[in-house]
């Protein structure tokens, strides 16, 4: 690296990733071969269109790698069709909407405050500006999806598309019930499985493909790949519409270096050790949930079936998530502040924090380490961010993470 400014920033970020406990639910650590592919010579190649149907010459090897990625994605998800070109999960959703909707059509999706995503019809997002969005939430008592209430709302709204899936929901999503609801009102069903796609591939969460018309996902998070997107379907009538909605509908040339990395991601997820990894992810979040509950914290939906959980700090300890996020980061523990269902506080100072287990499980953390994380979180909160407590735990974190090294051979 010749540019000294960027070299310093890259090395600082490398040290941060090596030295911190990463608990952001949407983050993970990719393998070194995925890092290598993302920085490969495919960065230079432009190739609008699809394999063997390009608008540029010189695409022989680009065609090979994209077809490999398509075939491997279809294999691991048991899908008839895969489009590996979306640049992100949001881009995948934008293309999915474009394939079946017209401007001002109605969609019904999970509300942002209840655990949905910006791209599910939020007013500040293109999805909410282009389509007429209504939102369902969770039951106020259980904080779980209420399928009878969603059915009733769907009958009233009469959407053309129902979106199921979330960015902050810790329980199993019943795709079969969503499929029945969508069918009963004549709507398409889109399953956004960005957070749980790794669990689906490993067999630890039901696959939506038998019930959903379209499935979208990111390829990072629990799939542990590059930051990108993917669209799947078993509905053969939608294949051409989806392809056209991605290119030329919402994107130009695909990022071939990222598609190369996506192929490696899908290949890694097809191995037996990936299934073991996902089981450990689930076990680790379960012990963290149990530890925090025993210490007096309210866990949203009373626990987790996947890789994440949300803590209601405000009702538990009369404190907000932004403060706890800051205190924990000072101790080298990274989480994100998050709204909880029916939150009485603002997005800038919400009642909760969201915690995920995927990244640190990649580094080798077990239930022992995740129990310790719960104890540290509690100790910092009980001290109200006392600098002495934070410094003590920061030193303990330093000792722990050194036992679980990553990217030892990388230096910029």
Curated annotation (Swiss-Prot):
Chief location category: cytoplasm
Compartments, record wording: Cytoplasm
Pathway note: One-carbon metabolism; tetrahydrofolate interconversion; Amino-acid biosynthesis; glycine biosynthesis; glycine from L-serine: step 1/1
SUPFAM superfamilies referenced in this protein's UniProt entry, alphabetically: PLP-dependent transferases (SSF53383)
InterPro entries listed in its UniProt record: PyrdxlP-dep_Trfase (IPR015424), PyrdxlP-dep_Trfase_major (IPR015421), PyrdxlP-dep_Trfase_small (IPR015422), Ser_HO-MeTrfase (IPR001085), Ser_HO-MeTrfase-like (IPR049943), Ser_HO-MeTrfase_PLP_BS (IPR019798), SHMT-like_dom (IPR039429)
Site entry (Plays an important role in substrate specificity), positions: 220
Coiled coil feature spans: none
GO cellular component terms given for this protein: cytosol
Name of the molecule in the record: Serine hydroxymethyltransferase
Species for this entry: Malacoplasma penetrans (strain HF-2) (Mycoplasma penetrans)
């Amino acid at each position: 690296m010749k540019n000294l400014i960027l070299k310093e920033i890259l090395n600082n970020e490398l040290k941060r990733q090596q030295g911190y406990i990463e608990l952001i639910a949407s983050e993970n650590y990719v393998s070194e071969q995925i890092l290598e592919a993302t920085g490969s010579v495919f960065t230079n190649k432009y190739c609008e269109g699809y394999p063997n149907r390009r608008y540029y010459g010189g695409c022989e090897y680009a065609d090979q790698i994209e077809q490999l990625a398509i075939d491997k994605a279809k294999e691991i998800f048991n899908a008839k069709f895969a489009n590996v070109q979306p640049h992100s999960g949001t881009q995948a959703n934008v293309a999915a909407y474009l394939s079946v909707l017209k401007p001002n059509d109605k969609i019904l999706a999970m509300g942002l405050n209840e655990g949905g995503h910006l791209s599910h019809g939020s007013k500040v997002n293109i999805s909410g500006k282009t389509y007429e969005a209504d939102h369902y939430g969770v039951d106020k008592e259980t904080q779980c999806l209420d399928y009878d209430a969603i059915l009733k709302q769907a009958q009233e709204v009469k959407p053309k598309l129902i979106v199921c899936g979330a960015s902050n929901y810790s329980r199993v999503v019943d795709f079969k019930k969503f499929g029945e609801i969508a069918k009963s009102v004549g709507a398409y069903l889109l399953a956004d499985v960005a957070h749980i796609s790794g669990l689906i591939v490993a067999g630890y969460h039901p696959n939506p493909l038998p019930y959903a018309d379209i499935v979208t996902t990111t390829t990072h998070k629990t799939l542990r790949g590059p930051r990108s997107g993917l669209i799947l379907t078993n509905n053969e009538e939608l294949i051409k519409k989806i392809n056209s909605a991605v290119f030329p509908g919402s994107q130009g040339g695909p990022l071939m270096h990222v598609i190369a990395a996506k192929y490696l991601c899908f290949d890694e997820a097809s191995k037996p050790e990936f299934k073991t990894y996902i089981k450990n992810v689930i076990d680790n979040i379960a012990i963290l949930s149990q530890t925090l509950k025993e210490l007096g914290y309210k866990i949203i939906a009373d626990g987790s079936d996947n890789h994440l959980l949300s803590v209601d700090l405000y009702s538990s300890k009369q404190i907000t998530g932004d403060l706890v996020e800051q205190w924990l980061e000072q101790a080298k523990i990274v989480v994100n502040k998050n709204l909880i269902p029916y939150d009485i506080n603002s997005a800038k100072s919400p009642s909760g924090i969201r915690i995920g287990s995927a990244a640190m499980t990649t580094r080798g953390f077990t239930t022992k380490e995740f129990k310790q994380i719960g104890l540290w979180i509690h100790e910092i909160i009980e001290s109200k961010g006392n600098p002495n407590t934070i410094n003590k735990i920061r030193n303990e974190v330093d000792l722990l993470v050194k036992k679980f090294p990553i990217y030892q051979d990388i230096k910029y």
